[in-house]
Amino acid sequence: MGKIIGIDLGTTNSCVAVMDGGKARVLENAEGDRTTPSIIAYTQDGEVLVGQPAKRQAVTNPQNTLFAIKRLIGRRFEDAEAQRDKDIMPYKIVAADNGDAWVEVKDQKIAPPQISAEVLKKMKKTAEDFLGETVTEAVITVPAYFNDAQRQATKDAGRIAGLDVKRIINEPTAAALAYGMDKGVGNRTIAVYDLGGGTFDISIIEIDDVDGEKTFEVLATNGDTHLGGEDFDSRLINYLVDEFKKEQGIDLRNDPLAMQRLKEAAEKAKIELSSAQQTDVNLPYITADATGPKHMNIKVTRAKLESLVEELVARSMEPLKVALKDAGLSVSDIDDVILVGGQTRMPMVQKQVADFFGKEPRKDVNPDEAVAIGAAVQGGVLAGDVKDVLLLDVTPLSLGIETMGGVMTALISKNTTIPTKHSQVFSTAEDNQSAVTIHVLQGERKRAADNKSLGQFNLDGIQPAPRGMPQIEVTFDIDADGILHVSAKDKNSGREQNITIKASSGLSEDEIKQMVRDAEANAEADRKFEELVQVRNQADQLVHGTRKLVEEAGDKLPATDKSAIEEAVKALEAASKGEDKADIEAKIQALVQSSAKLQELAQQQAQAGEAQADTSAKKDDDVVDAEFEEVKDKK
């Protein structure tokens, strides 16, 4: 059985790890970095760039450079969050035919899972390069507060990337695994505060250690799937744009190129202000008008940045209170606080968390790598490489159905340990009703319309009876990935209907299969291109080597052989410019045959050189070694 890799598919950066010799190891990508920017670019010549190469060209290609796609995964176009992003992103967010939020690149609509699959493919390739074998299985992490649709869409992205997703696990839980495996023994209750590039989670986790066997039990989780470093960047960008407008009277929001440069500068300034008290945002030639070029030079202090993002940090505090209340604990019950996600490097965030819990967060857990390490540990558990670890996760939101009067009736409450199964009997609302619609919902509101709709299906063929008489048993079954399966059964007739909630991941089985085929076709095209390049290089080396030998042979090479070789070289050079691998290989063989006489001459010259070297060595052998004694002058 091959390795099951662990992937942290992040909003801003992604990371991959694998169990290696009993320990989780974070892998370096082709650029030598341990994290990869979750950025995908579609270039003018049809190439797809991922990670650092995509980030580098973002300034010149803002409309086709996609970042923070995780914020759109599993979302409807009309969702408030998607609408908010639509107004601030340089790329085009559009409605798909099924109402999902997709992205338009060069007049083509692309689904977020398909875009995220490009990042997953790079993670897969990074692991394959390290392991020296094909990787087909992975554990992928998601924010704890992701709903069913977002989890399903993440799983779809894995499939499109050619991965069998063995388990979807929550990011804070993965971070707790990384911490718990590394930090010795003893029972502890920890709080994982995870503020990443686009999402925020808080999980309260109990680690029980009995005779070296560790149980990680999530007691409660809460969060906000649209709060993260990208929002912090946006606040700073808006401030810089407004300041520039005051100074120069030009609104940079209408200039995608300037906005892309500003985005990079704002992110850099934010990072610098975690260690410095002030920084300069200096962008020469940011734009121009009739009076000439304009330059941006704005000083930003740490205090200014903190005042801009104060409300965002405060927003993360409310879920902390709810999670503690749901876990039935107070702050004094928390033994350790773990910070995860790049945005937690901001001193203001660290101070607010420390003030809330009354203790300093631990600094010995790498916020960028802990989640991938935990995912690799879970991969090791599933592969049987890691023993004595049990993970008990929870469902983040209540699940139920719409009942009479537009009310949501919960079948599974939030923070229920998964996997779990629950059934409840319902009845009809009208006399002689022959069918019922099961409308599946996720959320905490009483009114059905205020919750997230996960999908609906019909159960028909109910025998006519007065209202309230038929017995319809609805069963909710959540698997270990936190994905929901729902069935409804008429207890009288035995008729049953069931669905796995696909909801607004929105991709049908056929669409996913087509995307998998496209990805495989691209992989095949990439392989063929690589082979073609190798053959071209081989041809180039042969041409260079042959010309050198012709020069060295001089007059010793008969004129007929020389002209035959020159013809074969020209033919090979012409073939190398084309795309036909077989033709290049044939021309290589033709040149090898034409230069047989040349190879013979080269061999003879080499042997003659060796014989000469032997003769001079013999002469050296005749020299007698004499011992000598140093005579010192007498003084």
Swiss-Prot record:
| SUPFAM superfamilies tied to this protein | Actin-like ATPase domain, Heat shock protein 70kD (HSP70), peptide-binding domain
Coiled coil ranges: none
Name the InterPro entries on file.
Answer: ATPase_NBD, Chaperone_DnaK, Heat_shock_70_CS, HSP70_C_sf, HSP70_peptide-bd_sf, Hsp_70_fam
Report the domain of life of the source organism. Answer: Bacteria
- The disulfide bonds in this chain are none
**Phosphothreonine modified-residue sites:** 199
Induced by what? By stress conditions e.g. heat shock.
Q: Where is the composition biased (Low complexity)?
A: 603-613
The GO molecular function terms of this record are: ATP binding; ATP-dependent protein folding chaperone; unfolded protein binding
Q: Which Pfam families match?
A: HSP70
Q: Which UniProt keywords apply?
A: ATP-binding, Chaperone, Nucleotide-binding, Phosphoprotein, Stress response
The UniProt annotation puts the region (Disordered) at: 603-635
Determine if Nucleotide-binding is one of this entry's keywords.
Answer: yes
Similarity comment text for this entry: Belongs to the heat shock protein 70 family.
| Cited function | Acts as a chaperone.
Q: What is this protein called?
A: Chaperone protein DnaK
> From which source organism is this entry?
Edwardsiella ictaluri (strain 93-146)
Q: Corresponding gene?
A: dnaK
